[in-house]
Structures are given as structure tokens and as C-alpha cells.
Regions:
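Sec-dependent bacterial lipoprotein signal peptides
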Residues: 1-25
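Short solvent-exposed coil/turn linkers within tandem alpha-helical repeat scaffolds
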Residues: 30, 65-79, 90-97, 128-141
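Residue-level signature for tetratricopeptide repeat
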Residues: 42-45, 49, 109, 149
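Alpha-helical linker/edge segments of TPR/alpha-solenoid repeat scaffolds
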Residues: 78-103, 108, 144-163
């Protein structure tokens, strides 16, 4: 009778170990989604605290993640129908859209603070960086923001002086 008990305990220990190991396995997709969320939250927290440089670094981290995911998707493009590639592509789009939205928010931050040259530079950076067809709505919003800035703070023109 002790033999079946020992076997039963071994089985229970084996099941418990399997469950523990399974819970330790990482879902890299979820980890990266959480990283994007954390960097985006930190971006806005830094803007609220007027730590612009830190906010920019957080957004650059999101851009780097999107770029890395884009490379992974391109390398695995031949594996069509792969749920891993589809998840990676969806996460890449999310990271890219998040970063673009954050740049627009940074431009708005500068405009509110009446730092018009920085706002213009931020919008131009966004327009120059996000050139894919899927980025069009963000580019158009940045172009509208530039036109709005021109109404608030017309660009200075240097005219030649007459001697």
C-alpha cells in the first residue's frame, strides 16, 4: 500500500513542478506589450513633470522596439499564416502608432508652453520619420499642427537689408 502512495506523491510533485515551470514561461509578446505601455506611461508622466529629455528617450525606446519588431517580421515574412508573425506585426503597428502619437503630443506640449521652434521641429521630425502609408493620418495631423503654429507664431522671414 505504501508503493501506490509513493507513486501518487511522485505524480503530484511532478504535476506541481510542471505547473510551476509553466507559470515561469514568459510570454514575450505580452512582455513587449507591457514595455510599450510602460514607456508610453513614462512618456506622459515625464511631460507632466516637464522632463522633456526623459520623455523623448522613452519615446525613442518605443521607436526602437517597433524597428526591431519590423526586422523580425521582415525576416519571417515567408512564414505566412504564422500566428507568431501576425502577433509580432500587430505589436509593431501598435508600437509605431504609439510613438507617432507621442511625438504629436510632444509637439502640442511645446506649443502650449509657447516653445514654437521646438514644436515645429517635433512636428517636422514626425513628418520626416513616419513615411509609410499607414502613418498618413499622423503625418496629416502634424502638417495641420504646423499650419496652426504659423497662425499663432508666424515664421520669421529674413529680408535683405538695403544699404
Amino acid at each position: 500500500m505504501t508503493r501506490p502512495r509513493v507513486a501518487s506523491y511522485r505524480f503530484m510533485v511532478l504535476v506541481a513542478c510542471s505547473l510551476i515551470l509553466a507559470s515561469c514561461a514568459h510570454d514575450t509578446y505580452q512582455e513587449r506589450a507591457d514595455q510599450i505601455k510602460n514607456h508610453s506611461g513614462a512618456f506622459y508622466d515625464n511631460l507632466k513633470s516637464n522632463r522633456v529629455e526623459s520623455a523623448i528617450r522613452d519615446n525613442e525606446q518605443i521607436e526602437a522596439m517597433a524597428s526591431e519588431m519590423g526586422n523580425t517580421v521582415r525576416k519571417r515574412a515567408g512564414q505566412q499564416g504564422s500566428s507568431t508573425v501576425e502577433r509580432e506585426f500587430a505589436l509593431m503597428k501598435t508600437a509605431n502608432e504609439t510613438a507617432a502619437t507621442n511625438w504629436l503630443a510632444l509637439g502640442q506640449y511645446f506649443a502650449i508652453k509657447r516653445q514654437y521652434p521646438q514644436a515645429r521641429a517635433t512636428y517636422r521630425r514626425m513628418i520626416d520619420t513616419y513615411t509609410n502609408p499607414t502613418d498618413r493620418p499622423h503625418r496629416e495631423q502634424a502638417l495641420r499642427a504646423l499650419r496652426d503654429l504659423d497662425m499663432i507664431d508666424p515664421p520669421t522671414t529674413t529680408s535683405p537689408t538695403n544699404p
